[in-house]
Amino acid sequence: MRSTPAQWDRVYWEGKHLLMNLLDIEVPMISAINGPAWRHSEIPLLCDIVLAADDVQFQDSAHFPNGMVPGDGMHIIYPLLLGWNRGRYFLLTGQVLDAPKALELGLVNELLPRPDLLPRAWALAEQLAQRPSLLLRYTRVLFTQPLKRQLLDYLGYGLALEGMSVVDRTVTPDT
């Protein structure tokens, strides 16, 4: 699939705003990942508490293996969570991380059988909701500030480079 700069402009604009808007939510966020996280898994990983089904898998199948620069936030989130070398390896190789490995590496906080996933998320949400609103708000603001700075510095640049690769790419059967 080919794309023009004008078409990519919308992706660029939406990509920059989506992640920042999620980080602007001023209460702790909980994600419950109940299926394969192969595309845009940076979104649930932006949450403060990340729960996952015990059969979940993580992979960035959309970018480098498919001829695209992983510049839409993946290049920030995965090296941050996995460590610099491990994060780049994950993005460059199309590595699949199963649920136990994701827990071991710190991508997720808890693994649960699929039927228990949403009840656990609700239980945690109810537990957090008992805390004072200022405590919740300012803890979230404190936790998200370093990530916001990285996104401000590198997300637009990454999206621009991803756009260049999308406009230029030709996907071969080997990729």
Regions found by a protein language model. Give the residues of each.
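Terminal peptide-recognition signature
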Residues: 28, 44, 102, 139
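C-terminal alpha-helix plus adjacent terminal tail
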Residues: 94-99, 119, 123-126, 130-175
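Glycine- (often His-adjacent) and acidic-residue-rich active-site loop
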Residues: 1-17, 64-66
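CoA-thioester-processing core
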Residues: 18, 22-24, 32, 37-90, ...
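Short, structured loop/turn "capping" segments at alpha-beta junctions
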Residues: 84-88, 97-104, 132
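Short acidic-hydrophobic, aromatic-tinged amphipathic segments that line or gate anion-handling sites
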Residues: 51-52, 108-120
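Glycine-rich phosphate-binding loop at the start of an alpha helix
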Residues: 12, 16, 38-39, 96, ...
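Short secondary-structure boundary segments
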Residues: 55-56, 94, 114-115
